[in-house]
């Protein structure tokens, strides 16, 4: 690794970038530097660490971009597994929990990819995650009789 005094880590030449800190930390300017340096994949590990403009720059450049609402879901999923374990007064092994989490994350990936393809945006994980999220909320609203 290399430290660049006075610059963000987004100025390093990397294949994969993982913004995992604060909202809007990775800007359009940062995205353009990453793209120029040959980044192949950006996977968010926080809630919206990339600005909308940065996400659009990645899309335009053909960079594989995984939005936090999908790629960062592991923490929320693990909390849900912990609540389930506690409610059942059970004790799960690390391997059992890890396997359940892997299943959840694989399902999120597959659902986002399939939904994007179904709606004519194959490979667009942002579109797949957004449409999937909208459908889940809409189905819940309808199931509750609110519409």
Regions found by a protein language model. Give the residues of each.
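A structured beta-alpha segment of the ubiquitous adenosine-cofactor-binding alpha/beta core
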Residues: 1-30
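Adenosine-phosphate binding glycine-rich loop
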Residues: 35-147
């Amino acid at each position: 690794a290399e430290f660049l005094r006075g610059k963000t880590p987004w100025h390093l030449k990397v294949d994969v970038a993982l913004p995992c800190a604060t909202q809007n930390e990775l800007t359009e300017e940062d995205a353009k530097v990453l793209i120029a340096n040959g980044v192949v994949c950006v996977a968010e590990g926080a809630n919206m660490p990339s600005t909308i403009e940065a996400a659009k720059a990645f899309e335009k450049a053909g960079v594989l971009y995984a939005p936090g609402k999908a790629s960062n879901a592991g923490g929320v999923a693990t909390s849900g597994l912990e609540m389930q374990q506690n409610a059942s007064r059970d004790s799960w092994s690390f391997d059992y929990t890890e396997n359940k989490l892997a299943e959840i994350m694989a399902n999120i990936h597959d659902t986002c990819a399939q939904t994007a393809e179904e709606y004519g945006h194959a490979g667009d994980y942002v579109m797949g995650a957004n449409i999937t999220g909208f459908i889940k909320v809409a189905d819940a609203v309808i199931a509750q009789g609110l519409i």
